[in-house]
């Protein structure tokens, strides 16, 4: 389901060597690891330490020793990673990155369904929801 940096090496040529070196230097200095979603640009995947889907990346972050997680993805991915890694710093390089699926249901919709069908109605979702919805 996920791949490590090795799967992105063919795209690394598009990233200048001095840029890659600077990224490695900053990662070391700030005790950081870069996680990238499959949907981000190939150049970002090329410099990421891990590439995968949102749930994999959030879980993976918990197993990594670095204290700073740079999550290249959309808002809910950063939120999920932070929920699972409260003791770590989670950075989202593009805070405006968004996923339309994360907005397909609102808190008001869930509350309305509970009002109609009862409070014991369970709302089930994959990780594609923002925190205000859950």
Where are these regions (language model features)?
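Metallocofactor- and cofactor-centric catalytic cores in central/energy metabolism, strongly enriched
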Residues: 2-84, 89, 93-125
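Conserved small/polar residues in nucleotide/adenosyl-binding loops
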Residues: 127-133
